[in-house]
């Protein structure tokens, strides 16, 4: 793991394995370690590149930044490591960034995997969930809030109680607010038809944050896209159905 200055910001980047590059982007409020459950096995086939996006994990945390900054950072990482073309995988917020990258530089994305995505939003899906259930979570800390709302996030709450860190954050309230603000008013729908990469869109059947209809919409708008629905997952298929998820990803990337 190394801190590297990209676009004037120190980003914490980890590279593992050999083969074709596969860049993975994590969720809102999270960090790259949450992707280890899939990045580690995938590193047997690919050179996996994970990083803490700006404002997250061990990367630098500016007071303000935008979704475009995240997009530029991915392209900056590719430039820094002389990666002309890559496989790109994004999860939740990471899928928003991945869509932006594939639109901005379609010639640089060989294959694209969008996990529990949406193509547009007034704010983050997590923030919307908090607002919808404001009375239910009133007075609760972040951990208590996640426990209360877990039934809206996943299919099997019993299994996911062992992986609560997927939805929790080590950001301060101010840092989390900045991360949410970066996702204000984005809409990729008119530009999705310009994506040229073969694309796999994966949604969880029981996802109340970014439901399958959001993934299906994206798959219809991207010319060379296929849609897969995880039957026993909510918003965390990489944890809820890890083996099935890896099989889908490996089959798609290795074919």
PLM regions: where:
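Acidic catalytic loop of the alpha/beta-hydrolase fold
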Residues: 206-210
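Conserved alpha/beta-hydrolase catalytic His-Asp/Glu region
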Residues: 123-125, 142-193
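Short beta-strand/loop motif that positions the catalytic acidic residue
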Residues: 195, 201-203
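Flexible "cap/lid" loop of the alpha/beta hydrolase fold
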Residues: 99-104, 110-139
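Conserved HGGG/HGGXW glycine-rich cap/lid loop of the alpha/beta-hydrolase fold
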Residues: 9-60
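Catalytic histidine-centered segment of alpha/beta-hydrolase-like enzymes
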Residues: 233-246
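Gly/Ala-rich beta-loop-alpha elbow adjacent to hydrolase catalytic centers
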Residues: 90, 94, 98
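Active-site loop/oxyanion-hole signature of alpha/beta-hydrolase fold enzymes
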Residues: 40, 49-89, 247
């Amino acid at each position: 793991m190394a801190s590297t200055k990209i676009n004037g910001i120190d980003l914490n980047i980890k590279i593992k394995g050999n083969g074709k590059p596969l860049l993975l982007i994590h969720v809102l409020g999270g960090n790259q370690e949450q992707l280890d459950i899939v990045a580690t096995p995938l590193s047997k086939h690919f050179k996996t590149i994970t990083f803490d996006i700006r404002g997250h994990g061990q990367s630098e945390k500016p007071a303000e930044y935008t979704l475009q900054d995240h997009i530029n950072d991915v392209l900056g990482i590719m430039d820094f490591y002389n990666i002309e073309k890559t496989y790109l995988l994004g999860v939740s917020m990471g899928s928003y960034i991945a869509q932006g990258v594939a639109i901005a530089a379609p010639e640089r994305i060989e294959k694209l995997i969008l996990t529990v995505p949406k193509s547009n939003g007034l704010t983050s899906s997590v923030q919307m969930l908090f607002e919808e259930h404001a009375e239910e979570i009133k007075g609760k800390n972040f951990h208590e809030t996640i426990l209360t709302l877990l039934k809206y996030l996943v299919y099997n709450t019993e299994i996911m109680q062992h992986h609560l860190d997927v939805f929790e954050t080590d950001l301060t309230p101010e840092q989390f607010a900045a991360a949410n603000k970066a996702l204000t008013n984005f809409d990729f729908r008119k530009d999705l038809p310009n994506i040229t990469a073969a694309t796999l869109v994966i949604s969880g059947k029981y996802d109340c944050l970014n439901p399958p209809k959001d993934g299906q919409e994206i798959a219809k708008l991207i010319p060379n896209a296929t849609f897969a629905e995880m039957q026993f997952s909510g918003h965390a298929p990489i944890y809820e159905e890890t083996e099935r998820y890896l099989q889908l990803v490996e089959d798609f990337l290795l074919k």
